Curated annotation (Swiss-Prot):
Optimum pH is 10. Is active in a broad pH range, namely, between pH 6.0 and 10.5. InterPro entries: Fervidolysin-like_N_prodom, Fervidolysin_dom, Fervidolysin_SD2, Ig-like_fold, Ig_Fls_DR_A0283-like, Peptidase_S8/S53_dom, Peptidase_S8/S53_dom_sf, Peptidase_S8_Asp-AS. This is Fervidolysin. The gene is fls. Pfam families: Fervidolysin_NPro-like, Fervidolysin_SD2, Ig_DR_A0283-like, Peptidase_S8. The keyword Calcium applies. Its EC number is 3.4.21.-.
Amino acid sequence: MRKVLLIASIVALILALFSCANPSFEPRSKAKDLASLPEIKSQGYHILFGELRDGEYTEGKILVGYNDRSEVDKIVKAVNGKVVLELPQIKVVSIKLNGMTVKQAYDKIKALALKGIRYVEPSYKRELIKPTVVKPNPDMYKIRKPGLNSTARDYGEELSNELWGLEAIGVTQQLWEEASGTNIIVAVVDTGVDGTHPDLEGQVIAGYRPAFDEELPAGTDSSYGGSHGTHVAGTIAAKKDGKGIVGVAPGAKIMPIVIFDDPALVGGNGYVGDDYVAAGIIWATDHGAKVMNHSWGGWGYSYTMKEAFDYAMEHGVVMVVSAGNNTSDSHHQYPAGYPGVIQVAALDYYGGTFRVAGFSSRSDGVSVGAPGVTILSTVPGEDSIGYEGHNENVPATNGGTYDYYQGTSMAAPHVTGVVAVLLQKFPNAKPWQIRKLLENTAFDFNGNGWDHDTGYGLVKLDAALQGPLPTQGGVEEFQVVVTDAKGNFGVPTVFVSMMRDNGSCYYAKTGPDGIARFPHIDSGTYDIFVGGPDHWDRALAPYDGESIPGGYAIALRMAEERQASFVGFGVSPDATQLNVNFNSTLQVKFSTNLSTLKDPQFVVVDPLLRGVYGRVAYARNQTYDLSLLSGQISFGIQTLLPAATDITIQGTVTLNGEDIPVYGVLKAGTTWTIIDDFGGLNLGTDSQPIYVWWTIFGQ
């Protein structure tokens, strides 16, 4: 059975049958077991725990999102950890663990009474979207489409004839007279960049190495982690000097942000972690970057990284990401799956036509395609930190080293360069305006309109420069707010999909506040699908303003998931929010004859037995409808006198239309038992019980 994880505080809605049965709610057992608590106000979800799938996260640290920084100190003490990174811009800290696994840290944290903590999550594993090093095939471009030929590749550089990608996207020397990305800062969030390469001299400004909190001086070799970032940087902004190659935006400046560092220093594959990626993105944003290139990704949904991306876009930064090299349809990879980004597929040109590259990931989030096959660009020199080899047959006279790579990692920087050029012409453009301009002016070479392979088609800089900047057709942020039926608490970890008629889609998950944020998306008509919560996420249930000590909010029933759909919802500057109220139904019926017991009653309690929400006389085959309650409840049977023998009490819970057998054992000498589908399972201890609960949203 799938585990569905959900938490909420109880809304004190007492059914009519309870209110007339025992208005004082006096307990039948000791006060410490069933203390009277007639009302609990809804507090919402207090701590959200990121998913832990084997092999998809790294050990050694946890990331904590907070509202109250002082509460973080309790976590640090409990896990015997050390704060190694502070991100006040998004209210996140990174805590290094000392000999403790992430799962063990979760267990320690769930035992605390905390206020003001939003989430705890691991750092997920990410990979560079590794390119293939290729030897150029001289016959590859012999059969040419009219207008795509070597004589048109005159960029005044000695290797102009190799730059088929620039020609394909409409770059000309005349175009650069209008705009070349002059003074636009481009953050290459990647391995480091060799700023001493002859084609990058003067192009690389100060950057940042977040894992070591080190500012990288302008013009230096920072190619920690390998050659990937240098190749990306050359495609974007290699200088125009008559030698070597030239980038799409030779007037732009490169800001290296090293997130794939030296594996010998940071471990693993060199990935510094979601926390340091967030630090790098924030640093780049705060230091003037206007567009960022991300040619990397992975599977885990990181709230920290999502907030960093949102932070950048809120400050007007355009985020360009590679679609990936997985060939098949790929969904829920990040950062490509975050809303508001420009996701780029890789294209090839062969036999007189363009086509999607065989390795390029297909996705319902692809925006545009760009050249990604046999791309010549800069690589670190032989004496450089990140030297990984070069193509010795490239006839450059400037002493620089070059190589041919292919992958969506090579496609994305073509688009990033295009964005830099456009931002020179449209310096106040919002991220959604730039993306929409690219999509509106793309070359739909296969005539399909938008598709999973190439998005809206091949990006065309010449057309985009001539096209007007859209003033309509986008919103700066759209929100989907998911709450219980009464709107008392937000529901986190709910997946929200926004699908358009053409099949393209945006995805996001609700955060601890129950809000899914979609920054800088297109306006228009969407079919919106809401479902969850995500069964891989965990949370702590709130209680009277604090998290329940030990309350790992595990609801073990698929039937507790809720879904909602909104067909034809119009998103516009005047309609930037959708409110979704989940609702539930829950009825209980017992089949066991309890006539031998003294005054048995059906009792609804909170999972810690701190409060009695209602009671009524027990009756066999009577339906008890709890559908007006919202939050987490447990229930059981209580008698006036102890049972003489063990009695197994059986029944059925009908939860959202699904029948679930339940039972509990009233042991000899006791007066009560919890009833559930696990036989009254106590996740806590006798002195601090935590019973399996039922999560419902009310009506």
